[in-house]
Amino acid sequence: RRDPAIRAADAARLVALYSHGVDPAHRRLKLDVAGGPPLPPTLIQAGGAEMLLADARHLAADIRTGGGRCTLQVWPDQVHVFQALPRLSPEAVKAMKHVARFIDTSMRDNGIEAISGKAV
């Protein structure tokens, strides 16, 4: 399925520009979450219509394999960074409320009180 925000060829060109002259197999270009220390609680939100959806699923699996806690939310029919587009996507506001609750819960679970003292 085609990503409405960017073509695959354009995304590949951006990666090539970023890593120009570096072997694609170089360890600095590979994210090894599963082989490192466990990450803190992580929330990943991905749009169901974005080309990075498979990457989001892979990252969530790696975080869990590495002993971390990860919540993956896939928002149907949404594009990459839909959360930044509340005028175009009503789901953006709902998604950001999930983010706020996730942060609040993660902080409370670790004994950190919100600065305002108000629960989200």
Summary of predicted features, one role per range:
Residues R1-V120:
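Alpha/beta-hydrolase superfamily serine-hydrolase fold, recognizing
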